[in-house]
Every structure is written in C-alpha cells, then in structure tokens.
C-alpha cells in the first residue's frame, strides 16, 4: 500500500535494478549482497544500466541473501531514493533508447527494513524473470517497428538512387532482397 498507490497514481516513479557491472545479464552472477541483521538488511553492491533510475523514487533491487544457493539465493527489496548509503550515478550515454535515463546505482551499507523484502528470501530470481518476461514483448515490438522503419526508408532510397540510368529499386536483385526483408518482418509480426 505504501508503495503501490503512489506508483499506480503516477505521483512517484519506480524502476527495476537487476543488471550489474560484472554480471551483465547473468542474474545468477549477482554480487550485490543483502545481509540480514535483526529487523533489517544491509545492502552492498552496485547495479548498472537501470532504466528510468535517474528520476525514480522507488527501486526494486535484487541482491544475494545466500550465495550458496545460486539463483535461489537472490531476493528482491524495495529501496527508496534518499536512503543513507544509496546513490544514483549520472546517466550513461548509449546509442538507442535515449528517452529513458540509465544510471548506475550504488549501495554502501544501505539499511533496508525487513518489511521491504518482496515475497520471501530466495524468491527474487523468480520475481525478476516474471517481470522480464512481461517486458520482453515490448522490446520485441520496438525492434519490429525499427525494422519496418528501416525497410520503409530503404524503399524510399532505392526509388531515388540511380545507377546505370535507372533507379536501383528497379533491379530484380534489389526487389528480391527487399521482398525477403519484408517477409521476415511480416513473419515476426505474426509471432
């Protein structure tokens, strides 16, 4: 309730912190740790390329609570902007998706109340994968749109560019290549 209503109403923004500098997309390679001490956890480590982190208020962060259990030792926590020891780095420049900030997050002995554990200890990997599965369809849709846009621009270009006295779009080989590309995009759209 404390976090859901502000997020659902748009009064606060949230993000999802899984990727780490030394683990990349290998969630099992997490090095961020959360050690339970009484009624709280102490979080140490870092995350990188965390989408929307530059303006978020609430962060779902994944950390190892038991390294001996591999992915079953990963837990999920709610971290609030401004918690002592929690810092948000500068936006990381990248080639695409520039509308969203992507920053590094650093945790230096961040005290996280035990009530900020999402689910139970060891359920973090399952939570992360369920979240990623939902987001992957969006990434696929973006990629499909980019591919279609590239084909549309190519069609314009081959209709204007001349070689040997005629547009290169009039050559049979060019038509075959464009038809093949369009067929692949259409097939992807039907998935």
PLM segments and residue spans:
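N-terminal glycine-rich flavin-associated loop
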Residues: 1, 24-27
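FAD-binding glycine-rich core of flavoenzymes that anchor FAD
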Residues: 1-20, 36-39
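Internal helix-loop-helix
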Residues: 1-10, 51-58, 70, 137
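Short Gly/Pro-enriched turn/cap motifs at secondary-structure boundaries
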Residues: 22-25, 49-52, 66-68, 94-101
């Amino acid at each position: 309730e404390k976090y859901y209503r502000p997020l659902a109403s748009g009064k606060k923004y949230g993000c999802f912190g899984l990727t780490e500098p030394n683990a990349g997309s290998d969630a099992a390679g997490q090095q961020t740790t959360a050690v339970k001490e009484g009624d709280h956890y102490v979080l140490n480590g870092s995350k990188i390329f965390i989408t929307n982190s530059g303006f978020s208020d609430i962060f779902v962060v994944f950390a190892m609570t038991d390294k001996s259990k591999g992915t079953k030792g990963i837990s999920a926590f709610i971290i609030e902007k401004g918690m002592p020891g929690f810092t948000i780095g500068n936006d990381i420049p990248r080639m695409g998706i520039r509308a969203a900030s992507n920053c590094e997050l650093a945790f230096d002995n961040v005290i996280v109340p035990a009530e900020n554990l999402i689910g139970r200890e060891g359920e973090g990997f399952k939570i992360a994968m369920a979240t990623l599965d939902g987001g992957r369809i969006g990434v696929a849709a973006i990629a499909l749109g980019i591919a279609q846009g590239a084909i549309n621009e190519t069609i314009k270009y081959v209709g204007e560019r001349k070689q040997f006295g005629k547009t290169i779009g009039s050559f049979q080989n060019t038509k075959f290549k464009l038809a093949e590309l369009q067929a692949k995009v259409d097939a992807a759209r039907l998935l």
